[in-house]
């Protein structure tokens, strides 16, 4: 869902949508779930004190550092991987389990990488666009990369399935809450907006924001990382 935030001004690789009819049906199903469950719950969570929400965001961002670091290595960026693993160690200890983002205060910038992006840097084409029930928009490439990224997630290796499920639900709730204030950006055909924004954001992430000049995108990237 966070991918809906990015403007349609970015250039991105060509991704076909041969399953549009099926994708639209799935999109309507997801919209129904969001309207009846996710959005009302996120609206309730929005009333929580900002420091609590900030701590939750930081903690879940911290859990993704291992996945990001591993993929940085696979993409041939060892120094960036060192930066990210350093963030994880510092924030997990001094930052009390990642609640406080000490790493950023020390000048260690946060990055986001997954195995789908790694496949892209290896030259694997995006493949067709697909909309999945509950999970939302994907390309075929990112769909194949998802199991590896899930395996590299810290929560995947938690032995208590109830705790694992609970953390994933809180993560989804936290992400949905951050979207409430930017829903006004949605315009025109919502399906096309979501699809195009998703593809453009993937391109932005794969290129690490290089050679892309878009102040709106920079602002939104800061919003997501904060």
Task: Describe each region flagged by the PLM.
Residues 14-28:
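Short N-terminal segments immediately surrounding and downstream of signal-peptide cleavage
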Residues 6-12:
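N-terminal signal peptide c-region/cleavage motif recognized by signal peptidases
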Residues 32, 36-40, 62-66:
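Amphipathic, well-ordered alpha-helical segments in soluble domains
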Residues 36-54:
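Membrane interface segments of multi-pass transport proteins and intramembrane proteases
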Residues 1-3:
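Sec-dependent signal peptide recognition
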Residues 50-77:
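A glycine-rich, hydrophobic loop/mini-helix early in the fold
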Residues 62, 72-137:
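Mid-length scaffold segments of soluble, non-membrane domains
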Residues 13-14, 122-226:
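A structured, mid-to-C-terminal "fold-capping" secondary-structure block
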């Amino acid at each position: 869902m966070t991918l809906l935030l990015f403007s349609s001004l970015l250039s991105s690789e060509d991704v076909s949508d041969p399953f549009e009819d099926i994708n639209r049906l799935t999109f309507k199903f997801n919209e129904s779930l969001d309207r009846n469950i996710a959005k009302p719950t996120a609206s309730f969570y929005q009333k929580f004190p900002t420091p609590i929400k900030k701590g939750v965001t930081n903690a879940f961002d911290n859990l993704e550092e291992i996945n990001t670091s591993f993929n940085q290595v696979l993409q041939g960026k060892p120094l960036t991987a060192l930066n990210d693993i350093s963030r994880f160690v510092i924030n997990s200890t001094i930052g009390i389990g990642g609640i406080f983002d000490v790493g950023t205060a020390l000048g260690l910038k946060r990055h986001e990488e997954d195995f789908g992006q790694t496949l892209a840097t290896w030259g694997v084409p995006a493949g067709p666009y697909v909309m999945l029930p509950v999970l939302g928009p994907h390309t075929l490439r990112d769909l194949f990369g998802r199991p590896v990224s899930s395996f590299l997630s810290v929560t995947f290796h938690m032995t208590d399935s109830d705790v694992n499920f609970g953390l994933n639900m809180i993560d989804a709730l936290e992400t949905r809450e951050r979207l409430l204030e930017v829903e006004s950006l949605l315009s025109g055909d919502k399906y096309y907006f979501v699809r195009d924004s998703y593809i453009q954001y993937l391109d932005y992430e794969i290129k690490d924001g290089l050679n892309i000049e878009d102040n709106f995108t920079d602002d939104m990237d800061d919003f997501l990382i904060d």
